[in-house]
Design a protein with these regions (language model features):
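Divalent metal-coordination and catalytic microenvironments
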Residues: 33, 43, 73, 80, ...
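Active-site-proximal beta-strand elements of phosphoester/diester hydrolases
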Residues: 22-25, 39-43, 132-138, 165-171, ...
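Metallo-beta-lactamase
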Residues: 2-18, 98-164, 248-271
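Active-site metal-binding loops of divalent metal-dependent hydrolases
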Residues: 44-46, 73-74, 138-140, 170-172, ...
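Pre-active-site segment of Zn-dependent metallo-hydrolases
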Residues: 9-13, 32-74, 78-89, 143-144, ...
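Metal-dependent catalytic neighborhoods of phosphoester/phosphodiester hydrolases
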Residues: 80-90, 105-109, 237-247
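Cap/insert and terminal regions of metallo-dependent hydrolase folds
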Residues: 95-97, 101-104, 173-265
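Structural motif
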Residues: 38-40, 67-68, 95, 131, ...
Length: 272
């Protein structure tokens, strides 16, 4: 397991084959993907806070190789406001894509230059650093679009580049229409939360996500190339056993591939 600059050097030195995506897990819902010559950080959670069960594997100032930073929604373990100024400085050419609904507040809070922050909303598709990125609304308990603007505060992203298609749901529950939206893509790699939700967490302000069964019942019928469960390891009281997901997938959708990732350990997926 590599950390810090050693991890950055490994990412820089890794060369994906044609039609291949390389990926690294940083814990929680944070992933790094590399496709061809593009390095994308999704929800990098790098602030070292006391409540974390897993310490950050990279310091914000070590993140020197980003082309794109994707933030799915404005919670601290997804859009890590304290870390963003250092990330922006360390990767001076990186672009930051986030929900349009939170763009103004995030810019004001982080000081990241407005010309580097790209607002997204379902069903927009934008080309960022030559990478095609589509926004898909996520229901973090609720869809909750702004009644005036129609902007969704929580998004997932479909990333298309180099013949590979990757979906990161962000924090999301199943809602009517989600599967239909995703059917338009042949997704090679998907990252889904499995920590679920309940009354106790909701009443204490911890809004939830798919259960492991719901994540399976999204991934299975859509036949994702490889589905990675996540968002189950970082905070006490908001956890799940990832083997529950992989076992359920194996029983119910035996032809679908899943994997429990290891921290900062590269894995690869080929386009189908």
């Amino acid at each position: 397991m590599k950390v810090g600059k050693d991890l950055i050097n490994e990412i820089d030195g890794s060369v994906p084959a044609t039609g291949e995506v390389l990926a690294w897990w940083l814990g929680q819902h944070s992933f790094i993907i590399k496709i061809k010559d593009r390095i994308i950080y999704i929800d990098p959670y790098l602030s070292d806070k006391d409540k974390r069960l897993i310490s950050p594997f990279i310091k914000p100032e070590e993140l020197t190789n980003a082309h794109i930073i994707l933030g799915t929604h404005d919670h601290s373990d997804h859009i890590d406001r304290p870390a963003w100024p250092a990330i922006a400085k360390a990767s001076p050419s990186a672009k930051f894509a986030i929900p349009e609904a939170v763009k103004k507040n995030v810019i004001e809070a982080t000081g990241v230059s407005a010309d580097r922050v790209i607002g997204m909303n379902d069903p927009e598709t934008k080309e960022i650093c030559s990478v095609k990125i589509s926004a898909v609304a996520s229901a973090h308990e609720f869809l909750a679009p702004d009644p005036k603007t129609g902007f969704y505060p929580c998004l997932g992203y479909v990333i298309e580049y180099g013949g590979v298609t990757v979906y990161h749901s962000g924090d999301c529950c199943i809602y009517d229409g989600l599967a239909s939206k995703l059917k338009k893509w042949k997704i090679d790699l998907a990252f889904l939360p499995i920590n679920g939700r309940d009354a106790l967490r909701y009443t204490t302000g911890c809004i939830g996500n798919m259960t492991f069964q719901e994540a399976a019942d999204l991934a299975g019928p859509l036949n994702f190339g490889l589905t990675i469960p996540s968002h189950y390891d970082m905070f006490a009281g908001n956890r799940e056993n990832p083997k529950s997901f992989t076992d359920y997938m194996a029983a119910k959708y035996p032809t679908c591939k899943t994997m429990i990732p290891r921290y900062t350990t590269v894995f690869s997926v080929k386009a189908r």
